């Protein structure tokens, strides 16, 4: 199945979180937490402005991003892969 985000939405594949602490302790379950870093797999055409123009998104497919998994984030399981649908404003930074 292929998903194409609309408007200012971005599809992100969450990166795996490190399962060891800095001291070498193996973390499991909720102790490991969920990563707030992922790879952009698809983007919408852009945000629709009040005058009807479309402002292209700053992120592109392949960017590694740090995101805020807030109220607007939606998790979807597609082809046995967990993906997040975020708005561009949920993305805090692009990792360069």
From Swiss-Prot:
GO cellular component, one term: cytoplasm
Sample GO molecular function, one term: protein folding chaperone
Cross-referenced PROSITE patterns: CHAPERONINS_CPN10
Superkingdom field: Bacteria
Primary residence: cytoplasm
Gene Ontology biological-process entries: chaperone cofactor-dependent protein refolding
Cited CDD domains: cpn10
Entries under InterPro entries matching the protein: Chaperonin_GroES, Chaperonin_GroES_sf, Chaprnonin_Cpn10_CS, GroES-like_sf
Subcellular location field: Cytoplasm
Keyword Cell membrane: no
Keyword terms of this UniProt record: Chaperone, Cytoplasm
HAMAP family given in the database record: CH10
Oligomeric and partner information: Heptamer of 7 subunits arranged in a ring. Interacts with the chaperonin GroEL.
Function: Together with the chaperonin GroEL, plays an essential role in assisting protein folding. The GroEL-GroES system forms a nano-cage that allows encapsulation of the non-native substrate proteins and provides a physical environment optimized to promote and accelerate protein folding. GroES binds to the apical surface of the GroEL ring, thereby capping the opening of the GroEL channel.
UniProt record similarity statement: Belongs to the GroES chaperonin family.
Protein name, entry field: Co-chaperonin GroES
Organism annotation: Buchnera aphidicola subsp. Acyrthosiphon pisum (strain APS)
Lineage, uppermost ranks: Bacteria, Pseudomonadati, Pseudomonadota, Gammaproteobacteria, Enterobacterales
């Amino acid at each position: 199945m292929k998903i194409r985000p609309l408007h200012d939405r971005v599809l992100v594949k969450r990166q795996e979180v490190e399962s060891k602490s800095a001291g070498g302790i193996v973390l499991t379950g909720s102790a490991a937490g969920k990563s707030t870093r992922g790879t952009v797999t698809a983007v919408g055409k852009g945000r629709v402005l009040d005058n009807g123009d479309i402002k292209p998104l700053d992120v592109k497919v392949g960017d590694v991003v740090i995101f805020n998994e807030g109220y607007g984030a939606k998790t979807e399981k597609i082809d046995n892969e967990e993906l997040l649908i975020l708005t561009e404003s949920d993305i805090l930074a692009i990792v360069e």
